[in-house]
């Protein structure tokens, strides 16, 4: 592997780790694991946080490849990716 590929791999890992490096984001992943297809409003209400905060965390999770967004006629629904499931399993090993 050359240096450029190595740098790219490290940046990819950094983006992934930054995606779940917040307790609220981990909570959101747990919520979506138990109840997929939630809207931003649903998640905000479940966690007792404001809409804007929930939306920002979901955006960061999506950038990290941990959450997928699906648009329906009324709202955008979110679900975790298989990568997020691995992350949650990994985090459980650290408890």
Predicted features and spans:
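Short, hydrophobic-biased segments on the C-terminal half of alpha helices
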Residues: 58-59
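Conserved segment of winged-helix/HTH DNA-binding domains
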Residues: 12-13, 17, 34, 75-95
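Short capping segments at the starts of secondary-structure elements
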Residues: 23, 35-39
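Alpha-helical residues within the helix-turn-helix
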Residues: 45, 62-63
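Short alpha-helical segments that sit at the start of domains
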Residues: 2-26
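Beta-hairpin "wing" of winged helix-turn-helix
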Residues: 63-73, 79
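Pre-recognition alpha-helix immediately N-terminal to the DNA-recognition helix
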Residues: 26-30, 86
């Amino acid at each position: 592997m050359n240096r450029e590929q190595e740098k790219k791999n490290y940046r990819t890992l950094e983006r992934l780790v930054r995606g779940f490096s917040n307790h609220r984001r981990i909570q959101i992943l747990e919520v979506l694991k138990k109840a997929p297809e939630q809207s931003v409003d649903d998640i905000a209400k479940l966690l007792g946080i404001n809409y804007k905060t929930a939306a920002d965390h979901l955006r960061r999770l999506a950038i990290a490849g941990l959450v997928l967004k699906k648009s329906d006629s009324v709202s955008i629904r979110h679900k975790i990716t298989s990568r997020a499931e691995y992350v949650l399993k990994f985090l459980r090993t650290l408890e």
